[in-house]
Amino acid sequence: MTIRCNIIRRILLYSLGMTILALGLTLNTKTNLGVSPILSIPYALSEMTSISFPDLVFLAYCLFILIQILIHIHLKQGDTKHILAIDCSQILVSMIFTRIMALYSMWIPIFDLECTSFFQTMPFRFLMLILAIVCTGIGAALTLDMKLIANPGDGVVAALAQLFKMPVGTCKNYVDISCVMITLFLSYQFTGHIIGIGIGTLIAMIGVGRVINVFNHLFTFSISSFKKEPV
């Protein structure tokens, strides 16, 4: 496999991963059972304002990118210019990613409010939640495995873990808990009830990581073959 073919295939798989990830995250919100922790703040704000969810996700991603840049400038490790260039490239990726989410948001109805009959029922909504978690896990695995540009949500966790010298998994838990706490505060402060946090939030916290592990275990050979540089 030539270097050019290798790069093209990695970009195609990365793009496929982004598309699947956007579907999973959007589908999660449409079940009305609770969104993933890191997106709970933009989701709650979108419900309290007239700003669309994808637009607020983009703003949240820009904030994550800014945090990464500040951390990398502070740490001054490795080729800082190269690292900062990669950080900034996340803005373009985030813009494309959130536009894909916007398309899905237009096409997919809110199941318990905009659908009828079986599509409103709890079993169907849980089925869609499971599908959302599977899509989120597969999409995240594909984008991470291609080693191109990190999703800002993953990138900020990695940067914070590096700053505080803790395992990425532990830092991810702290970030998730912080997002949930902020969402609960904003919800109660401005509406008097919980927005965006539910059983789906807890299932997503546990389930997405498991899906990533299973996917990488099943497709390790085929995925790694795309990442190898020719000898």
Question: Which positions does each model-derived feature cover?
Answer:
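Core subunits and conserved enzymes of cellular information-processing
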Residues: T2-V231
